[in-house]
Protein backbone atom coordinates (compact mmCIF):
# COMPACT_ATOMS: atom_id res chain seq x y z
CA UNK A 1 0.00 0.00 0.00
CA UNK A 2 1.50 3.33 -1.07
CA UNK A 3 0.33 6.87 -0.49
CA UNK A 4 1.41 10.35 -1.53
CA UNK A 5 2.81 12.22 1.48
CA UNK A 6 1.43 15.70 1.98
CA UNK A 7 4.05 18.29 0.95
CA UNK A 8 6.04 19.44 3.96
CA UNK A 9 6.60 23.04 5.03
CA UNK A 10 10.27 22.94 3.91
CA UNK A 11 9.22 21.51 0.54
CA UNK A 12 6.74 24.34 0.00
CA UNK A 13 8.60 27.19 1.74
CA UNK A 14 9.75 28.91 -1.46
CA UNK A 15 6.21 28.99 -2.83
CA UNK A 16 4.77 30.09 0.52
CA UNK A 17 7.18 33.02 0.60
CA UNK A 18 6.47 33.90 -3.03
CA UNK A 19 2.72 34.04 -2.43
CA UNK A 20 3.04 35.90 0.89
CA UNK A 21 5.15 38.59 -0.79
CA UNK A 22 2.90 38.87 -3.83
CA UNK A 23 5.38 37.38 -6.30
CA UNK A 24 3.20 34.32 -7.02
CA UNK A 25 -0.54 33.81 -7.26
CA UNK A 26 -2.23 31.74 -4.58
CA UNK A 27 -4.13 28.57 -5.41
CA UNK A 28 -6.97 29.72 -3.17
CA UNK A 29 -7.90 32.95 -1.45
CA UNK A 30 -10.49 33.25 1.32
CA UNK A 31 -11.60 36.87 1.24
CA UNK A 32 -13.07 39.07 3.95
CA UNK A 33 -13.52 36.83 6.96
CA UNK A 34 -13.32 37.12 10.71
CA UNK A 35 -10.03 35.44 11.64
CA UNK A 36 -10.36 33.36 14.80
CA UNK A 37 -6.82 33.36 16.14
CA UNK A 38 -6.46 30.51 18.63
CA UNK A 39 -2.90 31.55 19.52
CA UNK A 40 -4.00 34.90 20.95
CA UNK A 41 -7.68 34.11 21.59
CA UNK A 42 -8.84 36.96 19.35
CA UNK A 43 -11.37 37.52 16.58
CA UNK A 44 -9.92 39.86 13.95
CA UNK A 45 -12.34 41.23 11.39
CA UNK A 46 -11.64 41.76 7.70
CA UNK A 47 -8.84 39.28 6.98
CA UNK A 48 -7.86 37.26 3.91
CA UNK A 49 -6.17 33.86 3.85
CA UNK A 50 -3.92 32.95 0.91
CA UNK A 51 -3.24 29.27 0.27
CA UNK A 52 -0.68 27.53 -1.94
CA UNK A 53 -0.06 23.79 -2.31
CA UNK A 54 -2.43 23.02 0.55
CA UNK A 55 -0.68 25.28 3.07
CA UNK A 56 -1.38 28.76 4.36
CA UNK A 57 0.93 31.38 2.87
CA UNK A 58 -0.35 34.42 4.73
CA UNK A 59 -3.22 35.85 6.77
CA UNK A 60 -3.47 39.58 6.08
CA UNK A 61 -6.10 42.33 5.82
CA UNK A 62 -5.74 42.49 2.04
CA UNK A 63 -4.24 39.68 -0.03
CA UNK A 64 -5.40 40.82 -3.46
CA UNK A 65 -1.75 41.07 -4.48
CA UNK A 66 -1.62 37.26 -4.08
CA UNK A 67 -4.26 36.54 -6.70
CA UNK A 68 -4.11 35.52 -10.33
CA UNK A 69 -6.49 34.33 -13.04
CA UNK A 70 -6.45 30.77 -11.70
CA UNK A 71 -6.86 31.62 -8.01
CA UNK A 72 -9.95 30.00 -6.49
CA UNK A 73 -11.70 32.83 -4.69
CA UNK A 74 -13.93 32.05 -1.69
CA UNK A 75 -15.85 34.99 -0.27
CA UNK A 76 -16.23 34.63 3.48
CA UNK A 77 -18.65 37.59 3.56
CA UNK A 78 -17.85 38.33 7.17
CA UNK A 79 -18.13 34.78 8.40
CA UNK A 80 -15.79 33.40 11.02
CA UNK A 81 -12.73 31.51 9.81
CA UNK A 82 -11.87 28.88 12.42
CA UNK A 83 -9.26 26.10 12.30
CA UNK A 84 -10.42 22.64 11.29
CA UNK A 85 -11.46 20.71 14.38
CA UNK A 86 -9.25 18.04 15.95
CA UNK A 87 -10.43 14.97 17.88
CA UNK A 88 -7.71 14.30 20.43
CA UNK A 89 -8.73 10.74 21.33
CA UNK A 90 -11.01 8.41 19.44
CA UNK A 91 -11.56 4.94 18.07
CA UNK A 92 -12.75 4.80 14.48
CA UNK A 93 -14.06 1.28 14.99
CA UNK A 94 -16.63 2.59 17.48
CA UNK A 95 -18.35 4.30 14.56
CA UNK A 96 -18.85 0.83 13.05
CA UNK A 97 -17.20 2.29 9.94
CA UNK A 98 -13.89 1.93 8.14
CA UNK A 99 -11.54 4.94 8.19
CA UNK A 100 -12.75 5.97 4.73
CA UNK A 101 -16.42 5.96 5.66
CA UNK A 102 -15.72 7.54 9.05
CA UNK A 103 -13.89 10.37 7.28
CA UNK A 104 -16.76 10.79 4.84
CA UNK A 105 -19.16 11.06 7.80
CA UNK A 106 -17.22 13.64 9.84
CA UNK A 107 -15.79 15.90 7.13
CA UNK A 108 -19.10 17.81 6.75
CA UNK A 109 -19.03 18.42 10.52
CA UNK A 110 -15.68 20.21 10.29
CA UNK A 111 -13.37 17.52 11.66
CA UNK A 112 -10.12 17.72 9.71
CA UNK A 113 -7.74 15.98 12.13
CA UNK A 114 -8.24 12.80 14.14
CA UNK A 115 -5.93 11.09 16.60
CA UNK A 116 -7.12 7.52 16.54
CA UNK A 117 -6.15 4.45 18.52
CA UNK A 118 -7.15 1.31 16.55
CA UNK A 119 -6.83 -1.03 19.50
CA UNK A 120 -10.20 -2.59 18.72
CA UNK A 121 -8.95 -4.19 15.53
CA UNK A 122 -5.62 -4.97 17.22
CA UNK A 123 -7.43 -7.36 19.55
CA UNK A 124 -8.99 -9.19 16.60
CA UNK A 125 -6.34 -9.06 13.85
CA UNK A 126 -3.18 -7.97 15.64
CA UNK A 127 -0.44 -5.84 14.11
CA UNK A 128 -1.64 -6.65 10.60
CA UNK A 129 -5.06 -5.20 11.41
CA UNK A 130 -3.47 -2.05 12.83
CA UNK A 131 -1.47 -1.65 9.63
CA UNK A 132 -4.61 -1.95 7.52
CA UNK A 133 -6.30 0.81 9.52
CA UNK A 134 -3.14 2.94 9.37
CA UNK A 135 -2.84 2.54 5.61
CA UNK A 136 -6.46 3.39 4.87
CA UNK A 137 -6.14 6.40 7.18
CA UNK A 138 -3.23 7.74 5.14
CA UNK A 139 -5.32 7.57 1.97
CA UNK A 140 -7.91 10.08 3.22
CA UNK A 141 -8.27 13.77 2.25
CA UNK A 142 -8.11 14.79 5.92
CA UNK A 143 -5.54 14.11 8.64
CA UNK A 144 -5.97 10.79 10.41
CA UNK A 145 -3.03 10.26 12.75
CA UNK A 146 -2.60 6.82 14.29
CA UNK A 147 -1.52 5.96 17.81
CA UNK A 148 -0.03 2.50 18.02
CA UNK A 149 -2.20 0.35 20.33
CA UNK A 150 -0.50 -0.41 23.62
CA UNK A 151 -2.69 -2.92 25.38
CA UNK A 152 -3.92 -5.98 23.52
CA UNK A 153 -5.03 -7.59 25.73
CA UNK A 154 -6.06 -4.64 27.86
CA UNK A 155 -5.46 -6.59 31.08
CA UNK A 156 -3.21 -9.66 30.69
CA UNK A 157 -4.43 -12.63 32.69
CA UNK A 158 -8.00 -11.34 32.88
CA UNK A 159 -9.00 -11.97 29.26
CA UNK A 160 -7.83 -13.62 26.06
CA UNK A 161 -7.82 -11.87 22.71
CA UNK A 162 -7.40 -12.85 19.10
CA UNK A 163 -3.89 -11.40 19.03
CA UNK A 164 -1.39 -9.82 21.38
CA UNK A 165 0.55 -6.62 20.75
CA UNK A 166 4.17 -6.87 21.92
CA UNK A 167 6.75 -4.27 22.87
CA UNK A 168 8.62 -5.21 19.68
CA UNK A 169 5.48 -4.46 17.66
CA UNK A 170 5.29 -1.02 19.26
CA UNK A 171 8.94 -0.29 18.55
CA UNK A 172 8.55 -1.33 14.90
CA UNK A 173 5.40 0.76 14.43
CA UNK A 174 7.09 3.94 15.63
CA UNK A 175 8.75 4.10 12.19
CA UNK A 176 5.47 3.96 10.26
CA UNK A 177 4.66 7.24 8.50
CA UNK A 178 1.28 7.84 10.16
CA UNK A 179 2.18 6.95 13.76
CA UNK A 180 2.21 9.89 16.19
CA UNK A 181 2.46 8.04 19.48
CA UNK A 182 1.30 5.22 21.71
CA UNK A 183 -2.40 4.53 22.20
CA UNK A 184 -4.05 4.72 25.58
CA UNK A 185 -2.08 2.81 28.21
CA UNK A 186 -5.06 0.99 29.72
CA UNK A 187 -3.11 -1.35 31.95
CA UNK A 188 -2.74 1.31 34.61
CA UNK A 189 -1.92 -1.17 37.40
CA UNK A 190 0.85 -2.51 35.17
CA UNK A 191 2.37 0.95 34.78
CA UNK A 192 2.02 1.78 38.47
CA UNK A 193 3.76 -1.50 39.31
CA UNK A 194 6.51 -0.99 36.71
CA UNK A 195 5.52 -3.94 34.52
CA UNK A 196 8.49 -4.47 32.14
CA UNK A 197 6.33 -4.87 29.03
CA UNK A 198 4.39 -1.68 29.68
CA UNK A 199 7.55 0.28 30.41
CA UNK A 200 9.22 -1.10 27.27
CA UNK A 201 6.33 0.15 25.13
CA UNK A 202 6.44 3.57 26.76
CA UNK A 203 10.22 3.75 26.37
CA UNK A 204 10.06 2.89 22.67
CA UNK A 205 7.55 5.69 22.17
CA UNK A 206 9.47 8.27 24.17
CA UNK A 207 12.74 7.41 22.45
CA UNK A 208 10.99 8.00 19.13
CA UNK A 209 10.02 11.46 20.39
CA UNK A 210 6.30 10.68 20.33
CA UNK A 211 3.37 11.01 22.71
CA UNK A 212 2.24 8.36 25.19
CA UNK A 213 -1.54 8.15 25.56
CA UNK A 214 -3.04 7.57 28.97
CA UNK A 215 -6.02 5.78 30.51
CA UNK A 216 -6.25 5.96 34.29
CA UNK A 217 -9.72 4.64 35.09
CA UNK A 218 -9.60 4.77 38.87
CA UNK A 219 -10.87 7.29 41.43
CA UNK A 220 -7.70 6.69 43.48
CA UNK A 221 -5.58 9.83 43.19
CA UNK A 222 -2.97 8.62 45.66
CA UNK A 223 0.27 6.67 45.16
CA UNK A 224 -1.10 4.54 42.30
CA UNK A 225 -1.97 7.71 40.37
CA UNK A 226 1.42 9.23 41.12
CA UNK A 227 3.14 6.08 39.94
CA UNK A 228 1.12 6.02 36.74
CA UNK A 229 2.10 9.58 35.84
CA UNK A 230 5.73 8.87 36.70
CA UNK A 231 5.60 6.03 34.20
CA UNK A 232 5.14 8.41 31.28
CA UNK A 233 1.51 8.70 30.04
CA UNK A 234 0.97 12.29 28.93
CA UNK A 235 -2.82 12.57 28.85
CA UNK A 236 -5.96 10.95 30.21
CA UNK A 237 -9.59 10.86 29.10
CA UNK A 238 -11.05 8.71 31.90
CA UNK A 239 -11.82 11.52 34.33
CA UNK A 240 -15.45 11.93 35.34
CA UNK A 241 -15.42 14.87 37.78
CA UNK A 242 -13.78 18.24 38.33
CA UNK A 243 -11.27 16.82 40.82
CA UNK A 244 -10.08 14.33 38.19
CA UNK A 245 -9.43 17.07 35.64
CA UNK A 246 -7.63 19.29 38.15
CA UNK A 247 -5.45 16.45 39.44
CA UNK A 248 -4.30 15.54 35.95
CA UNK A 249 -3.54 19.10 34.86
CA UNK A 250 -1.68 19.91 38.07
CA UNK A 251 0.59 16.94 37.45
CA UNK A 252 1.46 18.06 33.92
CA UNK A 253 -0.92 15.80 32.03
CA UNK A 254 -3.43 16.94 29.45
CA UNK A 255 -6.95 16.36 30.70
CA UNK A 256 -9.00 15.10 27.77
CA UNK A 257 -12.70 15.56 28.45
CA UNK A 258 -15.03 13.54 26.27
CA UNK A 259 -18.47 13.71 24.81
CA UNK A 260 -19.13 10.49 22.95
CA UNK A 261 -22.33 8.72 22.09
CA UNK A 262 -22.77 7.55 25.68
CA UNK A 263 -19.99 9.29 27.65
CA UNK A 264 -21.03 12.70 28.99
CA UNK A 265 -17.94 13.81 30.90
CA UNK A 266 -17.52 17.41 29.70
CA UNK A 267 -20.01 19.21 31.93
CA UNK A 268 -18.66 17.68 35.14
CA UNK A 269 -15.01 18.56 34.38
CA UNK A 270 -15.01 21.80 32.40
CA UNK A 271 -15.80 23.67 35.61
CA UNK A 272 -12.08 23.39 36.35
CA UNK A 273 -11.78 26.09 33.66
CA UNK A 274 -15.09 27.94 33.87
CA UNK A 275 -15.38 28.12 37.67
CA UNK A 276 -11.96 27.39 39.15
CA UNK A 277 -10.18 29.49 36.53
CA UNK A 278 -7.41 27.03 35.68
CA UNK A 279 -5.33 27.62 32.56
CA UNK A 280 -7.20 25.94 29.67
CA UNK A 281 -4.06 25.09 27.70
CA UNK A 282 -3.91 21.66 29.30
CA UNK A 283 -7.50 20.68 28.58
CA UNK A 284 -8.51 18.98 25.33
CA UNK A 285 -11.90 18.02 23.92
CA UNK A 286 -12.42 14.57 22.42
CA UNK A 287 -15.11 12.00 21.63
CA UNK A 288 -13.50 8.63 22.49
CA UNK A 289 -16.41 6.58 21.08
CA UNK A 290 -19.11 7.74 18.66
CA UNK A 291 -21.34 5.34 16.78
CA UNK A 292 -22.53 6.04 13.26
CA UNK A 293 -25.95 7.27 14.34
CA UNK A 294 -24.39 10.05 16.40
CA UNK A 295 -22.10 11.04 13.53
CA UNK A 296 -24.90 11.24 10.98
CA UNK A 297 -27.62 12.73 13.18
CA UNK A 298 -25.78 14.89 15.72
CA UNK A 299 -22.27 15.59 14.49
CA UNK A 300 -18.75 14.96 15.68
CA UNK A 301 -16.30 17.48 17.18
CA UNK A 302 -18.67 20.35 16.33
CA UNK A 303 -21.12 18.67 18.70
CA UNK A 304 -18.48 18.53 21.44
CA UNK A 305 -17.47 22.18 21.02
CA UNK A 306 -21.11 23.32 21.08
CA UNK A 307 -21.70 21.27 24.22
CA UNK A 308 -18.68 22.83 25.95
CA UNK A 309 -20.03 26.28 25.11
CA UNK A 310 -23.46 25.32 26.44
CA UNK A 311 -21.72 24.27 29.66
CA UNK A 312 -20.45 27.83 30.11
CA UNK A 313 -17.14 27.74 28.28
CA UNK A 314 -16.06 30.81 26.32
CA UNK A 315 -16.40 29.93 22.60
CA UNK A 316 -12.80 30.89 21.86
CA UNK A 317 -11.54 28.72 24.72
CA UNK A 318 -13.69 25.82 23.55
CA UNK A 319 -12.22 26.18 20.06
CA UNK A 320 -8.70 26.22 21.49
CA UNK A 321 -9.46 22.93 23.26
CA UNK A 322 -10.47 21.39 19.92
CA UNK A 323 -7.64 22.81 17.81
CA UNK A 324 -4.35 24.28 19.01
CA UNK A 325 -4.33 22.50 22.39
CA UNK A 326 -4.67 19.15 20.66
CA UNK A 327 -2.08 19.94 18.00
CA UNK A 328 0.41 21.15 20.61
CA UNK A 329 -0.05 18.04 22.73
CA UNK A 330 1.01 15.82 19.84
CA UNK A 331 3.85 18.12 18.75
CA UNK A 332 2.00 19.13 15.60
CA UNK A 333 1.27 22.78 16.31
CA UNK A 334 3.47 23.74 13.34
CA UNK A 335 1.30 21.58 11.08
CA UNK A 336 -2.30 21.86 12.23
CA UNK A 337 -4.50 23.54 14.82
CA UNK A 338 -4.43 27.19 13.74
CA UNK A 339 -4.92 29.48 10.76
CA UNK A 340 -1.36 30.75 10.52
CA UNK A 341 1.38 30.70 7.87
CA UNK A 342 2.94 27.37 6.97
CA UNK A 343 0.20 25.26 8.52
CA UNK A 344 -2.04 22.94 6.57
CA UNK A 345 -4.96 24.89 5.20
CA UNK A 346 -7.64 23.23 7.34
CA UNK A 347 -10.29 25.91 7.74
CA UNK A 348 -14.01 26.11 8.55
CA UNK A 349 -16.32 28.96 7.62
CA UNK A 350 -19.18 29.48 10.06
CA UNK A 351 -21.65 32.29 10.68
CA UNK A 352 -21.94 31.80 14.45
CA UNK A 353 -19.31 30.87 17.04
CA UNK A 354 -21.84 29.60 19.56
CA UNK A 355 -24.14 27.39 17.51
CA UNK A 356 -21.28 26.57 15.13
CA UNK A 357 -23.06 25.79 11.86
CA UNK A 358 -20.45 24.16 9.61
CA UNK A 359 -21.00 25.91 6.29
CA UNK A 360 -17.75 25.36 4.37
CA UNK A 361 -14.91 22.98 5.19
CA UNK A 362 -11.47 23.28 3.63
CA UNK A 363 -8.86 20.58 4.23
CA UNK A 364 -5.32 20.82 2.90
CA UNK A 365 -6.39 23.69 0.69
CA UNK A 366 -9.30 21.84 -0.91
CA UNK A 367 -13.00 22.49 -0.37
CA UNK A 368 -14.12 19.15 1.04
CA UNK A 369 -17.63 19.97 2.28
CA UNK A 370 -20.37 22.55 1.79
CA UNK A 371 -23.55 22.87 3.83
CA UNK A 372 -23.38 19.36 5.24
CA UNK A 373 -22.37 17.57 2.06
CA UNK A 374 -19.02 15.83 1.57
CA UNK A 375 -17.56 16.84 -1.80
CA UNK A 376 -14.51 14.58 -2.00
CA UNK A 377 -13.74 10.93 -2.47
CA UNK A 378 -12.56 8.96 0.54
CA UNK A 379 -10.55 6.04 -0.91
CA UNK A 380 -11.05 2.50 0.42
CA UNK A 381 -8.43 -0.04 1.39
CA UNK A 382 -8.86 -3.47 -0.19
CA UNK A 383 -9.72 -5.45 2.94
CA UNK A 384 -8.62 -9.09 2.54
CA UNK A 385 -10.78 -12.14 3.18
CA UNK A 386 -9.00 -12.81 6.49
CA UNK A 387 -10.31 -9.49 7.80
CA UNK A 388 -13.86 -10.45 6.83
CA UNK A 389 -13.88 -13.92 8.40
CA UNK A 390 -13.28 -13.40 12.11
CA UNK A 391 -16.23 -14.98 13.92
CA UNK A 392 -15.14 -18.49 14.95
CA UNK A 393 -17.63 -19.93 17.44
CA UNK A 394 -16.69 -23.60 17.29
CA UNK A 395 -20.24 -24.89 17.54
CA UNK A 396 -23.90 -24.01 17.20
CA UNK A 397 -25.06 -22.71 20.57
CA UNK A 398 -28.23 -23.73 22.38
CA UNK A 399 -30.20 -22.46 25.39
CA UNK A 400 -28.23 -24.70 27.75
CA UNK A 401 -25.13 -22.62 26.95
CA UNK A 402 -26.88 -19.63 28.51
CA UNK A 403 -27.89 -20.96 31.91
CA UNK A 404 -26.43 -20.40 35.36
CA UNK A 405 -26.82 -23.32 37.73
CA UNK A 406 -27.47 -22.73 41.41
CA UNK A 407 -25.79 -24.59 44.26
CA UNK A 408 -27.56 -27.85 44.93
CA UNK A 409 -30.69 -27.42 47.05
CA UNK A 410 -30.73 -23.61 46.90
CA UNK A 411 -34.04 -21.80 46.54
CA UNK A 412 -32.40 -18.41 46.04
CA UNK A 413 -28.89 -17.02 45.67
CA UNK A 414 -27.05 -13.76 46.19
CA UNK A 415 -25.49 -12.77 42.87
CA UNK A 416 -22.80 -10.25 41.97
CA UNK A 417 -24.38 -8.13 39.25
CA UNK A 418 -22.89 -5.60 36.83
CA UNK A 419 -24.76 -2.30 37.25
CA UNK A 420 -24.93 -0.07 34.17
CA UNK A 421 -24.59 3.70 34.79
CA UNK A 422 -26.30 5.87 32.19
CA UNK A 423 -23.99 8.18 30.19
CA UNK A 424 -20.84 6.92 31.91
CA UNK A 425 -18.32 4.21 31.18
CA UNK A 426 -17.87 2.93 34.77
CA UNK A 427 -20.30 0.35 36.12
CA UNK A 428 -21.42 -0.39 39.67
CA UNK A 429 -20.80 -3.59 41.61
CA UNK A 430 -24.27 -4.62 42.76
CA UNK A 431 -25.70 -7.55 44.69
CA UNK A 432 -29.15 -9.02 44.06
CA UNK A 433 -31.04 -11.91 45.58
CA UNK A 434 -32.27 -14.01 42.67
CA UNK A 435 -34.68 -16.95 42.74
CA UNK A 436 -33.86 -20.49 41.65
CA UNK A 437 -36.16 -22.63 39.51
CA UNK A 438 -35.35 -26.27 38.74
CA UNK A 439 -31.76 -25.69 39.79
CA UNK A 440 -31.20 -22.68 37.56
CA UNK A 441 -30.78 -19.06 38.70
CA UNK A 442 -33.47 -16.80 37.26
CA UNK A 443 -32.91 -13.20 36.19
CA UNK A 444 -35.86 -11.18 37.48
CA UNK A 445 -36.96 -7.56 37.52
CA UNK A 446 -34.34 -5.29 35.98
CA UNK A 447 -31.70 -8.02 36.08
CA UNK A 448 -30.84 -9.66 32.76
CA UNK A 449 -28.35 -12.33 31.89
CA UNK A 450 -25.08 -11.46 30.19
CA UNK A 451 -22.81 -13.89 28.40
CA UNK A 452 -19.47 -13.64 26.64
CA UNK A 453 -19.12 -16.06 23.73
CA UNK A 454 -15.53 -16.81 22.70
CA UNK A 455 -15.15 -16.05 18.97
CA UNK A 456 -11.42 -15.90 18.18
CA UNK A 457 -10.26 -19.50 18.62
CA UNK A 458 -13.47 -21.53 18.08
CA UNK A 459 -13.41 -22.96 21.61
CA UNK A 460 -17.19 -22.93 21.98
CA UNK A 461 -16.73 -21.39 25.43
CA UNK A 462 -19.52 -19.28 26.96
CA UNK A 463 -19.12 -17.30 30.20
CA UNK A 464 -22.33 -16.27 31.97
CA UNK A 465 -23.16 -13.60 34.56
CA UNK A 466 -25.83 -10.99 35.36
CA UNK A 467 -26.32 -7.31 34.49
CA UNK A 468 -28.78 -4.65 35.67
CA UNK A 469 -29.84 -1.28 34.31
CA UNK A 470 -31.08 -1.91 30.78
CA UNK A 471 -34.72 -2.26 31.78
CA UNK A 472 -35.46 -5.06 29.33
CA UNK A 473 -38.93 -6.60 29.50
CA UNK A 474 -40.34 -9.77 28.00
CA UNK A 475 -38.40 -12.43 26.11
CA UNK A 476 -35.48 -10.93 24.20
CA UNK A 477 -31.75 -11.00 23.54
CA UNK A 478 -29.18 -8.71 21.97
CA UNK A 479 -25.79 -9.91 20.72
CA UNK A 480 -22.77 -7.96 19.48
CA UNK A 481 -19.27 -8.83 18.26
CA UNK A 482 -18.29 -5.30 19.31
CA UNK A 483 -17.24 -6.10 22.87
CA UNK A 484 -14.51 -3.77 24.04
CA UNK A 485 -11.71 -4.58 24.14
CA UNK A 486 -11.32 -8.31 23.61
CA UNK A 487 -14.15 -8.23 21.07
CA UNK A 488 -15.51 -11.67 21.69
CA UNK A 489 -19.31 -11.68 21.50
CA UNK A 490 -21.48 -10.09 24.20
CA UNK A 491 -25.01 -11.41 24.56
CA UNK A 492 -27.48 -9.74 26.93
CA UNK A 493 -30.96 -11.12 27.29
CA UNK A 494 -33.87 -12.35 29.34
CA UNK A 495 -34.45 -15.60 27.45
CA UNK A 496 -31.91 -18.37 26.83
CA UNK A 497 -33.48 -19.42 23.53
CA UNK A 498 -33.28 -15.90 22.12
CA UNK A 499 -29.72 -15.55 23.42
CA UNK A 500 -28.72 -18.65 21.47
CA UNK A 501 -30.56 -17.41 18.38
CA UNK A 502 -28.81 -14.05 18.53
CA UNK A 503 -25.35 -15.55 18.96
CA UNK A 504 -25.80 -18.04 16.14
CA UNK A 505 -27.12 -15.32 13.83
CA UNK A 506 -23.93 -13.31 14.23
CA UNK A 507 -21.95 -16.43 13.45
CA UNK A 508 -23.88 -16.72 10.20
CA UNK A 509 -23.36 -13.13 9.03
CA UNK A 510 -19.74 -12.78 10.16
CA UNK A 511 -20.26 -10.31 12.95
CA UNK A 512 -22.29 -7.28 13.90
CA UNK A 513 -25.21 -6.55 16.23
CA UNK A 514 -28.56 -8.32 16.32
CA UNK A 515 -31.66 -8.23 18.50
CA UNK A 516 -34.31 -10.92 18.89
CA UNK A 517 -37.66 -10.55 20.66
CA UNK A 518 -39.99 -13.50 21.20
CA UNK A 519 -37.96 -15.55 18.73
CA UNK A 520 -38.15 -12.95 15.94
CA UNK A 521 -35.24 -10.91 14.60
CA UNK A 522 -36.09 -7.22 15.00
CA UNK A 523 -32.85 -5.56 13.89
CA UNK A 524 -29.47 -6.47 12.43
CA UNK A 525 -26.36 -4.36 11.75
CA UNK A 526 -23.84 -6.35 9.72
CA UNK A 527 -20.20 -5.56 10.58
CA UNK A 528 -18.20 -7.91 8.37
CA UNK A 529 -14.74 -6.35 8.81
CA UNK A 530 -13.23 -7.88 11.96
CA UNK A 531 -16.78 -8.09 13.33
CA UNK A 532 -16.34 -4.40 14.13
CA UNK A 533 -16.86 -2.31 11.01
CA UNK A 534 -18.80 -1.94 7.80
CA UNK A 535 -17.43 -0.46 4.60
CA UNK A 536 -20.91 0.73 3.65
CA UNK A 537 -21.74 4.48 3.79
CA UNK A 538 -22.29 5.97 7.23
CA UNK A 539 -25.90 6.92 6.51
CA UNK A 540 -26.73 3.32 5.63
CA UNK A 541 -25.05 1.94 8.74
CA UNK A 542 -26.63 4.68 10.87
CA UNK A 543 -30.09 3.79 9.57
CA UNK A 544 -29.58 0.19 10.68
CA UNK A 545 -28.15 1.37 14.00
CA UNK A 546 -31.19 3.61 14.52
CA UNK A 547 -33.42 0.61 13.89
CA UNK A 548 -31.39 -1.30 16.48
CA UNK A 549 -31.84 1.47 19.04
CA UNK A 550 -35.58 1.47 18.39
CA UNK A 551 -35.67 -2.30 18.84
CA UNK A 552 -33.93 -1.88 22.21
CA UNK A 553 -36.56 0.68 23.21
CA UNK A 554 -39.28 -1.71 22.06
CA UNK A 555 -37.83 -4.21 24.54
CA UNK A 556 -38.13 -1.71 27.40
CA UNK A 557 -34.69 -0.09 27.40
CA UNK A 558 -34.76 3.67 27.96
CA UNK A 559 -31.02 4.32 28.44
CA UNK A 560 -29.40 6.97 26.29
CA UNK A 561 -27.33 5.21 23.63
CA UNK A 562 -27.70 1.89 25.36
CA UNK A 563 -25.77 0.12 22.62
CA UNK A 564 -22.54 1.83 23.68
CA UNK A 565 -23.16 0.71 27.27
CA UNK A 566 -23.75 -2.81 25.98
CA UNK A 567 -20.49 -2.84 24.02
CA UNK A 568 -18.30 -1.85 27.01
CA UNK A 569 -19.46 -4.48 29.47
CA UNK A 570 -16.38 -6.61 28.77
CA UNK A 571 -13.83 -3.79 29.16
CA UNK A 572 -11.88 -5.13 32.12
CA UNK A 573 -9.89 -1.94 32.74
CA UNK A 574 -12.79 0.32 33.75
CA UNK A 575 -14.34 -0.24 37.21
CA UNK A 576 -16.24 -1.66 38.83
CA UNK A 577 -17.51 -5.01 37.46
CA UNK A 578 -16.95 -6.47 33.97
CA UNK A 579 -17.30 -9.81 32.25
CA UNK A 580 -14.49 -11.51 30.35
CA UNK A 581 -14.15 -14.84 28.59
CA UNK A 582 -12.47 -16.05 31.80
CA UNK A 583 -15.09 -14.94 34.32
CA UNK A 584 -16.53 -12.00 36.26
CA UNK A 585 -13.88 -9.37 37.02
CA UNK A 586 -13.81 -6.89 39.89
CA UNK A 587 -11.76 -4.12 38.25
CA UNK A 588 -11.24 -2.38 41.60
CA UNK A 589 -8.96 -5.23 42.64
CA UNK A 590 -8.26 -6.80 39.22
CA UNK A 591 -9.43 -10.15 40.54
CA UNK A 592 -12.05 -12.66 39.49
CA UNK A 593 -15.08 -12.95 41.74
CA UNK A 594 -17.85 -15.56 41.72
CA UNK A 595 -21.13 -14.80 40.00
CA UNK A 596 -22.99 -16.53 42.86
CA UNK A 597 -21.93 -15.29 46.29
CA UNK A 598 -23.72 -17.72 48.53
CA UNK A 599 -26.91 -19.79 48.72
CA UNK A 600 -29.70 -18.46 50.94
Curated annotation (Swiss-Prot):
Gene behind the chain: ade
Protein's recorded name: Adenine deaminase
Catalysed reaction equations from the record: adenine + H2O + H(+) = hypoxanthine + NH4(+)
Keywords, in A-Z order: Hydrolase, Manganese
The protein's Enzyme Commission number: 3.5.4.2
CDD domains membership: AdeC
GO molecular function terms attached to this record: adenine deaminase activity
Cofactor(s), names only, from the UniProt record: Mn(2+)
Amino acid sequence: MTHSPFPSWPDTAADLIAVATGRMAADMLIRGGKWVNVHTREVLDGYDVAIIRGRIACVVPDATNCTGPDTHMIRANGRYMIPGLCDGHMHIESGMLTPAEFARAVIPHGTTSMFTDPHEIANVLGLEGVRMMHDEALMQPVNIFTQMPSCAPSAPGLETTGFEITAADVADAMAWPGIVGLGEMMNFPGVSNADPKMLAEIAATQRAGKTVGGHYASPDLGPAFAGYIAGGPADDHEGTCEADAIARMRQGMRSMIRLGSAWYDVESQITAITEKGLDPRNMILCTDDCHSGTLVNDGHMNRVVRHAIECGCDPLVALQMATINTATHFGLEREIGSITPGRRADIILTSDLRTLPIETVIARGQVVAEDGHCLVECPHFDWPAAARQTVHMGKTLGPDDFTINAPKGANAVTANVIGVVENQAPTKALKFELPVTEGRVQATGDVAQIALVERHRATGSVTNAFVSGFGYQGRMAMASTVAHDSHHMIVVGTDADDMARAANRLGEVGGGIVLFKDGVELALVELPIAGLMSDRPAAEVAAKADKMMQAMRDCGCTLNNAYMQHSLLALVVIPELRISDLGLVDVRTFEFIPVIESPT
